[in-house]
Amino acid sequence: MLLGIDEAGRGCLAGALFVAGVACANHLAQEFVAQGLKESKQLSRAKRFSWAQKIQAHKDIQSVVVAKSAEEIDSKGLSVCLQEAIKEIVLGLPQVLSVCIDGNTLFKLHFPHLKSFQAVIKGDDKIPQIAMASVLAKAHKDQEMIELDKLYPAYGFATNCGYGTHTHVVALAKHGYSPAHRYSFKLKSTYRWTRLKPEHRY
């Protein structure tokens, strides 16, 4: 059994960071791929929701999703939040002895009980369990931003999913922060780098 870990929302200006872990046998993960599962960016939102439901409902698949709020990201930093989430996932599935993380770093994390702990560049394209984790994390991020869009409709969260699109940046310039935004994140405008002020709330 292999545990794949991936995240969604790392580069967003608003909302939580979601880190997901999916553990299952390789043959089962390959079956999902054969049925059309791909890494999250290659799937529509509707298909991500559908696959996430199938992953979480399957009796032979173990999954964990950890959310780190915008407040936690502002107070601890994104890297610390990501490391904490990875620890929570790995330690929450102690029977799993092989772990692959999407990316190029293990963040100097060490788990003595693991037989294998690897960072895989473009792992969501190469390791089915990481692809499954990417879908699960992104589906949770999508759902969060749909809900936040209802609370703060001026920012277009349901469409931009919290990323710094042009329309999102324009809305920030007009309305300032909402309580859902990460106050510590910088924005790259057309003309300059600027840091939003925490007191500029919706």
What does each model-found stretch correspond to?
Residues 1-202:
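RNase H-like, Mg2+-dependent phosphodiesterase core
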